[in-house]
């Protein structure tokens, strides 16, 4: 019986499986590894630390509107044991962004009593300490040891915009009862957001809050359409900050530079890049059909592999060459700026016979999930027959695809088989890369390229079997 999948809370539960291909899945925690933080309205109530209700509906950021005064519990500590006492009370001390938890006492007129150098106040978490009896046994024993009375007093604390977290600010500003997000993918100094329709009127404010609350972020952009262009880049709107789109990114120890507005880069694929590179050995050859700016090609070259890297996008091609030089591996990478099929039927076909006579492995990476499975047909009858084909070192293919089917594993295998016009039974493995969106998965099917597919037979005529190669391919969104 074929594998039957059910989705529940974005997790896959494999109920029953009997398939010739092996399925592998990374720990689901790794799927979510990215610089992304999502805010859920079901989080614990903020209590005293909610921003003022008057900020609801604000579309232009007014930081002064967040000023307010709240009463919090505090305990009076002698300065001569202050550091020790604060350490002992760390679990119940107040912790808020930009706030000092040790403050001077107020005089009768409400101002700080600068003349009192013998005592200070430690501000306490009002969710933990509500009375003198709220201290736990450890805190109570520590106070007793320091001869400090368990007496709580009220302290008038002035809160400003600086003391609130980004999700707290956005939850207070956006319409109540609707989804709130402070999530973004970080690409160097750029925060890339995918805002929902109801958030768009607040997009400028959201962008400024993200910059204010995330050191190092100097530009916030929002995607304004899906990835439907020839080159997989997308239109974007700058919400806040500078308009500099040239980003510097370090991934798995490799430095990349590129114009984020003109190439494709997804920080959520870092783990997948690392997984494929871990399969490589010094002396192997890597054929990267849709190389982008080099997230597979450059680490492979650094690992001692010979690399043939290609991308149709002239900007990706330019930055691929730039990054190869930047990482001092340009002598190990041969680059092309061709359509994927032209690349396979041109430079790859020319090099493949000699490579297959060697003992080192050949890995073909095809990371264009919206279309790569269709490009597999370029391998059909690619090579002329040889006298002793049994000695050939056949390439290992790693081909990516999206699936919206209930059984994504079976779906991508069947689509690969349809393109190759062969049965991959017992010759492939399928890897779940990540959940892209509800009911949409990114998969990787790996297999040894069948000899019967690669070599031309007497019934095949390459001149008639090859169809014209479309130069412009439409790609669906892979980031959602």
Curated annotation (Swiss-Prot):
Among the Pfam families in the record, one is TYW2_N_2
UniProt keyword list: Cytoplasm, Methyltransferase, Mitochondrion, Nucleus, S-adenosyl-L-methionine, Transferase, Transit peptide, tRNA processing
Keyword Methyltransferase belongs to the record:
yes
Taxonomy, superkingdom: Eukaryota
Q: What is its main location?
A: mitochondrion
Localization of this protein: Mitochondrion matrix; Nucleus; Cytoplasm
Quote the record's binding site residues for S-adenosyl-L-methionine.
Answer: 273, 311-312, 339-340, 367
Q: Name one GO cellular component term.
A: nucleus
One MF term in GO for this entry? tRNA methyltransferase activity
Indicate the residues annotated as transit peptide.
Answer: 1-18
EC number(s) on file: 2.1.1.228
- CDD domains for this protein: AdoMet_MTases (cd02440)
Q: Which InterPro entries match?
A: MeTrfase_TRM5/TYW2 (IPR030382), SAM-dependent_MTases_sf (IPR029063), TRM5-TYW2-like_MTfase (IPR056743), TRM5/TYW2-like_N (IPR056744), tRNA_Gua_MeTrfase_euk (IPR025792)
Q: Where is this region: Disordered?
A: 458-480
Its biological purpose is as follows: Involved in mitochondrial tRNA methylation. Specifically methylates the N1 position of guanosine-37 in various tRNAs. Methylation is not dependent on the nature of the nucleoside 5' of the target nucleoside. This is the first step in the biosynthesis of wybutosine (yW), a modified base adjacent to the anticodon of tRNAs and required for accurate decoding.
* Entry similarity comment: Belongs to the class I-like SAM-binding methyltransferase superfamily. TRM5/TYW2 family.
Record's subunit section: Monomer.
Per its record, how is this protein called by name?
tRNA (guanine(37)-N(1))-methyltransferase
Provide the gene name from the record. Answer: trmt5
